[in-house]
Design a protein with these regions (language model features):
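Interdomain hinge/linker elements that couple catalytic modules in large macromolecular machines
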Residues: 107-191
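Hydrophobic positions on the alpha1 helix immediately C-terminal to the Walker A/P-loop
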Residues: 6-7
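Short glycine-/polar-rich loops that comprise or flank the Walker A/P-loop
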Residues: 12, 41, 68-70, 89-93
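Conserved nucleotide-sensing/catalytic segment adjacent to the nucleotide-binding pocket
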Residues: 25-73
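Short regulatory helix/loop adjacent to the ATP-binding pocket of P-loop NTPases
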Residues: 80-95, 106-111
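Conserved glycine(s) of the Walker
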Residues: 2-3
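Helical "lid/switch" subdomain of P-loop NTPase nucleotide-binding domains
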Residues: 48-51, 55, 78, 88, ...
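Post-Walker A helix-loop "phosphate-sensing" segment adjacent to the P-loop in P-loop NTPases
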Residues: 11-22
Length: 191
C-alpha cells in the first residue's frame, strides 16, 4: 500500500526494524531501553513497529510527556505477536491505507464510483476506453504501488502473486500464532 514510502515523505528521521543489518540489534535495544529508538528529528518514523511491540507503549508514554502532536509515525503491516499494554486511545491515531484505486492509478475516469454503487446512486453508467482485458489485468494486478508503476505486465502480476503467497504462507500465521492450511486458503481465494 506504500505505508512506509508515504510516512518517509513526512518524516525527518527514521528507524527501520526490518533492516537485516541493524534490525535484530534495534529489536533487542527496544527490549531494554525503547526510548532510545524514539530519538531523532520529529516527526520520527518507526517502521514495522510490531516487531518490538513495547515501542507502542514507549510512544504512548512519550506523548503523555507533551511536546505536541504528530511526533511519531508508526508503520507496520502485521499484527504484533505481543499486544501493547495500552490501546493508545487519545494519543495514537490509526490510518488505514488501501491499495491504489483504478482512479488513483489513472486507469479510470472515476465516472462510476464503487462507493456510489453501494450508496444507491440513482444513475450509474459510463463508457470506458479500457478493454475488458485491461480491466481484468488491473483487477488481477491489484493496486500495490510497485505493481501499478511496473511497466512489464508479467512482473506486475508476479508481484501480486508473490504478495498473496507471502500472506498465505507466513503473515497470516503471525497474526495469532495459529497454523492455517495455506492450500485450503488458496482454494477459497480461487473460488
Amino acid at each position: 500500500c506504500g505505508k512506509t514510502e508515504t510516512a518517509k515523505q513526512q518524516a525527518q528521521s527514521a528507524v527501520y526494524l526490518q533492516d537485516p543489518d541493524e534490525g535484530p540489534s534495534l529489536v533487542a535495544l527496544a527490549e531494554v531501553r525503547p526510548s532510545v529508538l524514539l530519538e531523532g528529528a520529529e516527526p520520527h518514523l518507526i517502521d514495522e513497529w510490531q516487531m518490538a511491540p513495547q515501542l507502542w507503549d514507549a510512544v504512548r508514554f512519550a506523548v503523555d510527556q507533551g511536546k505536541g502532536k504528530g511526533r511519531f509515525l508508526l508503520t507496520g503491516s502485521a499484527t504484533p505477536k505481543k499486544r501493547p499494554k495500552h490501546s493508545g486511545v487519545g494519543r495514537i491515531s490509526r490510518m488505514h491505507m488501501r491499495p491504489m484505486s483504478l482512479f488513483e492509478s489513472r486507469e479510470s475516469t472515476g465516472a462510476v464510483s464503487l462507493a456510489g454503487l453501494f450508496d444507491g446512486a440513482a444513475e450509474v453508467g459510463a463508457i470506458s476506453d479500457r478493454s475488458i482485458e485491461d480491466i481484468a489485468f488491473a483487477l488481477c494486478r491489484g493496486g500495490w504501488p510497485e505493481a501499478v508503476l511496473e511497466s512489464d505486465p508479467e512482473i506486475a502480476l508476479d508481484q501480486a502473486k508473490d504478495y498473496v503467497a507471502e500472506l498465505l504462507d507466513s503473515d497470516i500465521d503471525e497474526m495469532d500464532d495459529k497454523k492455517r492450511n495455506s492450500t485450503w486458503l488458496r482454494a477459497i481465494l480461487r473460488s
